[in-house]
Amino acid sequence: MNITFIGSGYVGLVSGIIMGYLGHNVTCFDNDDVKISKLNKKILPIYEAKLDEYLKQALESDRLKFTNIYSNDFRNVDAVFITVGTPSKELGEADLKYVYDAVDKVSKHINKDCLIVIKSTVPPGSCNNIIAYLKAKGFSFNVASNPEFLREGSAVEDFLYPDRIVVGVNNQESEALLRTIYAPLIEQGVKFLVTNLVTSELIKYASNSFLATKIAFINEMADLCEKIGANIKDLSQGVGLDQRIGRNFLNAGPGFGGSCFPKDILALNNLVENYKIDCKILKSVIKSNKLRPGNMVAKIATLLDGDLKGRNIAILGLTYKAGTDDVRASPAIEIITILLNKDVYVKAFDPIGLENAKKNLEHKNLLYFASAVEACESVDIIVIATEWSEFKELNWQEIYDLVKSPMIIDLRNILDNEVMKKIGFRYYAVGSKI
């Protein structure tokens, strides 16, 4: 099949590259000239495990190309996937201006039988509104919904071996075309769920909001564990081993971040409020997560006897989770911002996300370092803010000899308490009593 992706950000890029690898002829479009130039030279603008290998294979097989030009080549396309961003407006509502801009432009270049597939995360009802919008302009394209469920850090595996493929359609032609596109995965036994447009759109919001709820819940259980002496790791395992619940997203920490969970739960809350539904769960999760970075700073302050001003603090990990270079809505960045506002000197390190962090946050009291060891030199406390496996392998004995005060607060519970204490550190983790 001939497929085009409009928007070569995280979703469009991963989806387009893997679709090319699966045997389709793929064109990825983006307005960013520099990005397109780099992609044509096999240079990825994002970090994603194994994606560079698939990019190379797809390009060498001549099944993938990148462009910044809307051209007549689009007239031979069977399906156009819209994968542009849908950022939050001030009150949490999804901003669809990039979606409509993409729809406007492609509608002028594609053939009448081309299927427009909305892969961007959009509020329920959006596809029907787009159909009406196109009809008012004299177009009668089929429009389908096909939400993505890719996790940054494991997106390639998620695309190739998904739990399910969800499509929302309003006719058999659209369903048949999407079945053909996803045939390589369906033939492997992947569940292909067909529903209507609105339900498909809502599935994405409901899924992400439910996962965010699991994270907020286990974080609050960690707070209880601190008070009563329970073990949060054992609690997470004991709860997660129940197959009705599952073990994923039950790791206590500094809160959820990234480009999806915070945005999507806000958008879903905005949607239910528009329909005069008082969804207390969503509001509670949003509030709980918003307070989480501040709560982490309060724990740091307690360990430093309530005196933060002028302290030197090392922050190890800047991305919102391991396996990605994405610092959007990162709890680590939120924590650093709060600390800087309290006149703290911050020394920061991340194995992958350093450059993105530098673009996101600059301050006279914030220094970025090329190694964790350098960042820890002469600090009053070390904060593990992201669960990078590299941090487990650090020479902690060397770091112990360099710090001003041998104290660690592990916001991701990745280090071994006994090992750290044997070296000589005062070690505290989320869910343990301070």
Swiss-Prot record:
Pathway: Nucleotide-sugar biosynthesis; UDP-alpha-D-glucuronate biosynthesis; UDP-alpha-D-glucuronate from UDP-alpha-D-glucose: step 1/1. It catalyses: UDP-alpha-D-glucose + 2 NAD(+) + H2O = UDP-alpha-D-glucuronate + 2 NADH + 3 H(+). The active site is at C260 (nucleophile). SUPFAM superfamilies: 6-phosphogluconate dehydrogenase C-terminal domain-like (SSF48179), NAD(P)-binding Rossmann-fold domains (SSF51735), UDP-glucose/GDP-mannose dehydrogenase C-terminal domain (SSF52413). NAD(+) binds at residues 2-19, 30, 35, 121, 152, 263, 328. Disulfide bonds: none annotated. One of its GO terms (molecular function) is NAD binding. This is UDP-glucose 6-dehydrogenase. Substrate binds at E148, F149, L150, R151, E152, K204, N208, F249, L250, N251, A252, G253, G257, K321. Pfam families: UDPG_MGDP_dh (PF00984), UDPG_MGDP_dh_C (PF03720), UDPG_MGDP_dh_N (PF03721). Keywords: NAD, Oxidoreductase. The lineage of its organism: Bacteria, Pseudomonadati, Pseudomonadota, Alphaproteobacteria, Rickettsiales. NCBIfam families: NDP-sugDHase (TIGR03026). Belongs to the UDP-glucose/GDP-mannose dehydrogenase family. The keyword NAD applies. Its EC number is 1.1.1.22. It is an enzyme of class 1 (oxidoreductase). One of its GO terms (biological process) is UDP-glucuronate biosynthetic process. It comes from the Bacteria.
